[in-house]
């Protein structure tokens, strides 16, 4: 055994000499085995992902039908990374990013790096350069379907370009995956849906760009609208289901239900109420919601309004929920409140 041990030590020294220190190591010697994450900005999705958010140094694919909320989910992740002091980049291949909407979701558009490339090759080369810099914490590509190969752009309308996009994605991901892992960048690829022709049995839906992204992605999210949120005759948003169809860092197939409110994004208060009432942090009696014997409101929408007007209570509930699911409590936004200890009245909260 001593001869084998000596041979192994000699081989390890040779590998480190040739490829550099850290090129091979025992798994127990790795300083941080725990997966580092960044909150998705949606409490329900953090819980469904199993590790408290999107894993750093991994590839994430978000796909679903049109107007289902894919870009909204990605923008919330960007806003959360920026809130923690990170740098974000958005590669807008669809040329459709609305900066006003992004700002409403909490994105700091003054600091967001934006690229609107002409070709798929250009988009992926920009992504690679940003990842290899090691200075970008999250990068979003919107969308894979809009990454048009240069040959297709320069060709005639109607020319056949079979498999060009799939080859482009396959080559890019081969180059990107290692760099993404080393730089601990979260790489989010938004994708569309297509129908397979002639499928009689099984799911006819597929995503463009070939199979490479399906293999390289550590997390795949399927975003679907469930139903509209109405107050009277007015439609204010939609209940949306986000299914974790692939997860390499936690058990898959969990579903997060969130409220996407038009012009506001994912409702933080809605997730707090739903999950809080499921685990009895928030008590529900009939139509009334209450927390620590204080009534929040009658009906879900009224209770959401109350939590929006009282962010300190919302933060208390969210902290208890995160403790229950062993999630990172630092992801709870602090209520921006000024309180004078000499005053006996309730603290006032600036909602502007």
Swiss-Prot record:
Entry-linked Gene3D superfamilies: P-loop containing nucleotide triphosphate hydrolases (3.40.50.300)
Q: Which residues bind ATP?
A: 64-71
Acidic residues bias spans: 335-352
InterPro entries the UniProt entry points to: AAA+_ATPase, DNA_recomb/repair_RecA, DNA_recomb/repair_RecA_CS, P-loop_NTPase, RecA-like_C, RecA-like_N, RecA_ATP-bd, RecA_C_sf
Q: Which UniProt keywords apply?
A: ATP-binding, Cytoplasm, DNA damage, DNA recombination, DNA repair, DNA-binding, Nucleotide-binding, SOS response
Report the Pfam families cross-referenced here.
RecA, RecA_C
Gene Ontology annotations of biological process type: DNA recombination; DNA repair; SOS response
Q: What does the record give as the function of this protein? A: Can catalyze the hydrolysis of ATP in the presence of single-stranded DNA, the ATP-dependent uptake of single-stranded DNA by duplex DNA, and the ATP-dependent hybridization of homologous single-stranded DNAs. It interacts with LexA causing its activation and leading to its autocatalytic cleavage.
Positions of the UniProt region annotated as Disordered: 328-352
Task: Tell me what gene encodes this.
Answer: recA
Q: Where in the cell is it found?
A: Cytoplasm
One Gene Ontology CC term in the entry: cytosol
* Name this polypeptide is given: Protein RecA
Q: What is its main location?
A: cytoplasm
């Amino acid at each position: 055994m001593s001869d084998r041990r000596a041979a192994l030590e000699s081989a390890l020294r040779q590998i480190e000499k040739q490829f550099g220190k850290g090129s091979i190591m025992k798994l127990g010697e790795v300083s941080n085995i725990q997966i580092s994450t960044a909150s998705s900005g949606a409490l329900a999705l953090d819980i469904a992902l199993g590790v408290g958010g999107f894993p750093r140094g991994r590839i994430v694919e978000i796909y679903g039908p049109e107007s289902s909320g894919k870009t909204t989910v990605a923008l919330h992740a960007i806003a959360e990374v920026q809130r923690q002091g990170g740098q974000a980049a958005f590669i807008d291949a669809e040329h459709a990013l609305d900066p006003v909407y992004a700002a409403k979701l909490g994105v700091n558009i003054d600091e967001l790096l934006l690229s609107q490339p002409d070709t798929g090759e250009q988009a992926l080369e920009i992504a690679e350069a940003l990842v290899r810099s090691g200075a970008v914490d999250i990068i979003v590509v919107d969308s894979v379907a809009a990454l048009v190969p240069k040959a297709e752009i320069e060709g005639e309308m109607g020319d056949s370009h079979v498999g060009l996009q799939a080859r482009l994605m396959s080559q890019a991901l081969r180059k990107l995956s290692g760099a993404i892992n080393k730089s601990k960048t979260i790489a989010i690829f938004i994708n569309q849906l297509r129908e397979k022709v002639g499928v009689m049995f099984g799911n006819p839906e597929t995503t463009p760009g070939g199979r490479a992204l399906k293999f390289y992605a550590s997390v795949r999210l399927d975003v679907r609208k469930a139903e509209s949120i109405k107050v009277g005759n007015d439609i204010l948003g939609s209940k949306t289901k986000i299914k974790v169809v692939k997860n390499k860092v936690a058990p898959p197939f969990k579903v997060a239900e969130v409220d996407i409110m038009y012009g506001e994004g994912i409702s933080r208060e809605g997730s707090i109420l739903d999950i809080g009432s499921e685990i009895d942090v928030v008590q529900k009696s009939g139509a009334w919601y209450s927390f620590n014997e204080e009534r929040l409101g009658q009906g879900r929408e009224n209770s959401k309004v109350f939590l929006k007007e009282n962010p300190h209570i919302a933060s208390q509930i969210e902290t208890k929920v995160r403790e229950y699911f062993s999630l990172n409590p630092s992801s709870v936004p602090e209520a921006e409140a000024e309180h004078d200890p000499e005053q006996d009245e309730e603290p006032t909260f600036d909602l502007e």
